Amino acid sequence: GVLIDDDVIDFCNKECHNVVLSLDGRKEVHDRFRKDYAGHGSYDAIVPKFQEFVKKRGDKNYYMRGTYTHYNTDFTNDIFHMADLGFTELSMEPVVSKPTDPSALTAEDLPILKEQYEILAKEMIKRDREGRGFTFYHYMIDLTGGPCIYKRISGCGSGTEYMAVTPWGDLYPCHQFVGDPKYLM
C-alpha cells in the first residue's frame, strides 16, 4: 500500500478484475505488523491512498483484507473501523503462523472469536437497515453460486487468479508463501 500512486491505481483499474488491499483495521492494530521500510507503522500513509484507490475504482471489485491475531481477538472493531473509513467490501482472516509465535491464535481465544462473528452479523444487519451496509466476504453464502463454489471446483486460484505482491515488489502465488524462496516468482 505504501507504493500506491496514480499510475498503480490506473493500471489496476484497467487491468485487474479484483484487487485486495491490506489493512488490519484500527491504527494501533495495523501498525503492529505493517511497517514501512524505515520501521514505522504504515497506517497513516496507506489509508488515504486506499480511500483514493477505492473512489477511483468505481464499481469494480476490490476487498479490504485484514488479519486478526491473538493481539486483536476483538477484530469486529477492526472491521467496523474499516467500514467507518468508507470501505464496503471487507474481509478479515485469522493469522497463519507457527503455534509458538506470540501472535498465534490459541484455544483460549476461540470463545471470544466465535462471539465476534455473532457481533459482526448483528452489526451488519443494523448498519444495513441504516443504509450503511457493507459486505463481509466470508458471509457471502450462496450454496449454488457463491464465491467459494468455483474454488471447490478449480482450487483456490493461487498463482493463477491471485498473487501476493510484497512491499519490495516480489511476487508469490499466495500471501502464505511470502518469504519462502522456492515460491518466489
Question: Residue ranges of each PLM-predicted region?
Answer:
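Conserved SAM/AdoMet-binding glycine-rich loop
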Residues: 1-27
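Radical SAM enzyme [4Fe-4S]-AdoMet core and its adjacent flexible, acidic
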Residues: 28-47, 51, 55-168, 178-184
